[in-house]
Amino acid sequence: MAASVSASCLNRLSSLAVVLVALASAASAQLSSTFYDRSCPNALSTIRSGVNSAVRQEPRVGASLLRLHFHDCFVRGCDASLLLNDTSGEQSQGPNLTLNPRGFVVVNSIKAQVESVCPGIVSCADILAVAARDGVVALGGPSWTVLLGRRDSTASFAGQTSDLPPPTSSLGQLLSAYNKKNLNPTDMVALSGAHTIGQAQCSSFNDHIYNDTNINSAFAASLRANCPRAGSTALAPLDTTTPNAFDNAYYTNLLSQKGLLHSDQELFNSGSTDSTVRSFASSTSAFNSAFATAMVKMGNLSPQTGTQGQIRRSCWKVNS
């Protein structure tokens, strides 16, 4: 009898999972690269201009925008919930406390520019998705087609930021976190390549440089010189070779055990993803292609479409 009940529960859970995947797929199917062609034909050029201007002034903006998009999408989908200034919302949670404010400032500025051209038409979620792509391109990385038509969430979801894998994650934990979002191991390794730009605080990698053995000794020593064991908010580039260029140096660094975060080096540590890291390290085009594919998949995670949510007039607050 117990076995029968258990089987029944499993069948119901399986059916629910199928329904949820189907709903997510249906929402993604409503996205289109031409969504604003008639309603706001200058939307994409306005976003691109804003991103390029910001990156020229501060190259790290590209990494900030990319990280915002990732952190937004991994919590209940790409709905701009992360952008809401809610004191008890997503921004207040541990995984998001190190997000640089400049990313939010740039998105809010671009939103204001888009609103001046097409008021009430273009969502913050779409602006962030496009800005992340344009930031990568501005730093020499690949481009990809961003599907559009996302709407903005009316709430922030602090309780689900645990979906974001921490920098202390093992390979198994990384694979599990990405699999939960229907992203495969190749997607995971490719998206981790976003760490070819940007910086991290010492507190994010102190355990790695003081306690791990799978790290180049000279590299660890150089980092310890600026990062006391007790931790600090000092910064180090995620890619020490070409920190402001979107390239495949992140992977060549991993081959030399120069991954800044524990989770970075886990990708090349005698595990199942070693061969993918070698492939990306030896071929920029292979990395660029896989990264673009993975970004499209991630950008299509559980969007709000149709009459769901709203088109916020300001990205930092819901419409009154």
Swiss-Prot record:
* Organism of derivation: Zea mays (Maize)
Gene Ontology BP term (one): hydrogen peroxide catabolic process
Q: What name does this protein carry?
A: Peroxidase 66
Residues with glycosylation annotation: 85, 96, 211
Site-annotated residues for Transition state stabilizer: 67
Looking at the Swiss-Prot or TrEMBL record, what is one Pfam family this protein matches?
peroxidase
Signal peptide segment: 1-29
Annotated GO molecular function terms are: heme binding; lactoperoxidase activity; metal ion binding
Per UniProt, the cofactor note for this protein states: Binds 1 heme b (iron(II)-protoporphyrin IX) group per subunit. Binds 2 calcium ions per subunit.
According to the UniProt record, one GO cellular component term is: extracellular region
Q: Which cofactor does it need?
A: heme b; Ca(2+)
InterPro entries the UniProt entry points to? Haem_peroxidase, Haem_peroxidase_sf, Peroxidase_pln, Peroxidases_AS, Peroxidases_heam-ligand_BS, Secretory_peroxidase
Ligand binding (Ca(2+) 1): 72, 75, 77, 79, 81
